[in-house]
Amino acid sequence: VAVFSMEMSASQLALRLISSNGRVNATRLRTGQLEDEDWSRVTSAIRMLKETKIFIDDTPSLSPDVLRSKARRLKREHDLGLIVIDYLQLMAVPGNSENRATEISEISRSLKGLAKELNVPVIALSQLNRSLETRADKRPVMADLRESGAIEQDADVIMFIYRDDYYNK
């Protein structure tokens, strides 16, 4: 698994993975205030992550070409099985400043091509427009994908996370 995280550093992401897999409170893990029963879960989570082939790249403003180059190398050297990108709008297209929607379209098409070329699924996270905050029904729809209709065109599957309890407290 290759994770290209332009939002979080590799160490922040590793802490989150340990916290999640070990079912340990993230704040206690981050501050080192672990309780006795946390230690075995942290150790198990670290062991499991160590045995998992997971590569975290936290290069900021990654371009599609650089990402493609890194993914090809990982596929060749480690038989890459999944690519995760956090998140699409933080990628950059060098020299293209026409408009952001055009850039996002180019990035989206590039990721679709990469998935086909390497025969590897690509999960690309995306931000949503703030417009859904003003609607009565806060459930996200495809039109809420930020800066491009190309995302819905290029994606094989689009999934949204929605927590009713968050909006209806």
Report each predicted region and the residues it spans:
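Phosphate-binding/switch region of NTP-binding enzymes
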Residues: 103-169
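Conserved nucleotide-binding/hydrolysis micro-motifs of P-loop NTPases
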Residues: 8-11, 20, 60-63, 88-91, ...
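A generic structural signal for short
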Residues: 59, 99-100, 137
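Glycine-rich anion/phosphate-binding loops
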Residues: 65, 101-102
